[in-house]
Design a protein with these regions (language model features):
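Helix-rich cap/lid subdomain of alpha/beta-hydrolase
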Residues: 118, 122-172, 187-188
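Hydrophobic, aromatic-rich cap/lid helix
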Residues: 172-196
Length: 260
């Protein structure tokens, strides 16, 4: 493990592996950089991969108060560690974060961007966005109800059946999810009301590949909307892949895009 110091002096931990052009992975939802370690290992045969813990996750610090701009600065520090520029891959909500970072001043450092199933919940997608999501998360946090925070995320943000999540709460790994529950408030900060801010997305000039798996209709709907809004976008569907995409399915897509 290595680390960099972000602009506000927060320590950001990362793993570096492989050789070749630099690729930065922006992940971490209710977990740490180990979530994307299998993908990093596959990409390492052709790229130097920087897989980092977002602030508040894993071995990285979490200086308060939180602001989305601090996460842009964290990514900026990782890009500097990667030599000043890199290809960037972001998955799900962190993919939205990477998209906003590209539009928020980091475009010169991001050679190309690839994002997997940005979880915007749009009108016409067949899903209803959760109401007062961040406020409810914050209230549950104040009451010490971390398990209910995670349940709220899975049921109302992800769209999983409540009955399934009730079963998941009995799993031995659920306690680890509860430990990461405070980071859901950070994610809610940049996801907002889950709508896609078309004007903001349209200003992202970085060449971007928007990928989905075709298995979750509302996420495919969002992927199409993002790609149609970006000025320099390509689309790709990895047929048959759920939201928890297999590294073996994703790696060749990223290799092709980042090598072209």
């Amino acid at each position: 493990m290595s680390d960099v110091t972000s602009k506000d002096r927060t320590t950001i931990a990362y793993d570096q592996t492989g050789s070749g052009p630099a690729v930065v992975i922006v992940g971490c939802v209710l977990g740490d950089r180990s979530q994307q370690a299998p993908l990093a290992a596959l990409l390492a045969s052709r790229f130097t991969v920087f897989n980092y813990d977002r602030r508040g996750h894993g071995a990285s610090g979490n200086t308060e108060p939180y602001a989305v701009e601090r996460e842009f600065e964290d990514l900026d520090a990782i890009l500097d560690a990667a030599g000043g520029s890199a290809y960037v891959y972001g998955t799900s909500g962190p993919g939205v974060l990477a998209l906003y970072a590209a539009g928020g001043g980091l475009a010169p450092k991001i050679k190309k961007l690839a994002i997997w199933e940005p979880p915007f919940i749009l009108e016409g997608s067949g899903r209803q966005a959760p109401k007062d999501y961040k406020r409810r998360l914050t209230s549950l946090m104040a009451e010490g109800r971390r398990g209910d925070m995670v349940e709220l995320f899975f049921v109302e943000a992800v769209g999983m059946p409540a009955e399934l999540v009730a079963q998941m709460r009995q799993a031995p790994w659920w306690s680890a999810q509860e430990e990461m529950a405070p980071t859901l408030i950070q994610n809610a900060e940049f996801m907002g009301d889950f709508s896609m801010p078309a004007e903001r997305v349209a200003k992202v000039t970085t060449p971007t590949l928007v990928i989905d798996g075709g298995e979750t209709p509302w996420l495919s709907y969002a992927a199409r909307a993002v790609a149609n809004t970006l000025p320099h976008a390509e689309r790709r569907t990895i047929s048959g892949q759920p939201h928890n995409v297999a590294p073996e399915a994703m790696a060749p897509v990223l290799e092709e895009y980042f090598s072209s």
